[in-house]
Structure formats: structure tokens, C-alpha cells
Amino acid sequence: MKKLAHGDTSGKWPVKGAPYPLPGAILPYKRVVAFYGNLYAKRMGILGELPPKEMLAKLKGEVKNWEKADPTTPVQSALHYIAVVAQGDPGKDGKYRYRMPFKQIDTVLSLAKKSNSIVFLDVQVALSNIHAELPLLEKYLAMPQVHFGMDPEFSMKDGVTRPGKKIGTYDAADI
């Protein structure tokens, strides 16, 4: 852990008396290099911009760049997939979000397996909420290689404002 202080001798890191991360923890022991996006949209990140084979090759190259830049910190590749997308259309339930089909999430898991990557499932709740969206992803979040990402900027708590019209927020009550 002390090597993570990068020579800082102030004693602020690691925090005295704080528990160390559990064995197998990714952070702070590894650097996560993630490619972000949605398979349906070229404008939402690299996951949708490139064909899968090309995207994975580019991710592998980026991992190698980071390994070369800092050989002392292992690199963990990741696919950060937007599983619930805020949108301008209210949809059938008026929540202004679209849930990606499970087959798309399964495709991302397959790509991650090919590249030894972890997966972040990102949720943009819009007029919905975490308590409504999270249970639908539970089978995936139970997998050890799958993690959860919350997008606060699309959390429209007033129940009226469409996503993208203002910056949303989360607080402890949401979680």
C-alpha cells in the first residue's frame, strides 16, 4: 500500500487505522482502463463506434500503453456499458430511459471474456430511480466480473424534467 503513496511522507496515505482493501480488490492495486459506450450508438462512446474485434484490439493496445507508461501498476481492462440509457423520448412508461435488452448485455459479457476485461453496467435513470432499475440487473451484478456504475447527471428527481435539460444528482437516500 505504501507504494501507492508515490513517495508522499505526510502520513496521510495509507490512512492510519483504516482497513486495507480485501484480497482480490481491484482498486487501489490496479489501474482500470475502460472503454465506454453502448453497442447501439456510435456517438455514445467507443463500444458502439467500432466493430467488436477492432474495438477489443484497440483496448488491448491502450492497456499496453499504460503498462509501458507505468510498469509498477498492473492494468485491468474494462468495458463500461450503458445498460440503461437516458433519452429524449418518454417511452411507454414516461420515464425517459431505455433499458438495453439482456442479449446486448450478454454480448458485452462475451466481449469482456475474450479480452479478460471486467464489466461496468452503467445506469442513467432519468425519471426512474435506482431502486426500480437495479433489481433488473441483479443476475449480472451477482457475477464477480460485473460492477455497477451510476450516472447522477441523468437522475431527474423532480419527476418532470427531461434528461439533458439540467444536471441531475444522487444523494445517500437514493443509494
Q: What residue ranges belong to the model's regions?
A:
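Substrate-binding cleft of extracellular glycoside hydrolase catalytic domains
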Residues: 65-67, 74-153
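Alpha-helix N-cap and loop-to-helix initiation/capping positions
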Residues: 50-54, 96-100, 129-132, 166-174
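Substrate-binding surface in catalytic domains of secreted glycosidases
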Residues: 152-175
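Alpha/beta catalytic barrel-like cores
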Residues: 1-98
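Residue-identity detector for threonine
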Residues: 9, 72-73, 107, 161, ...
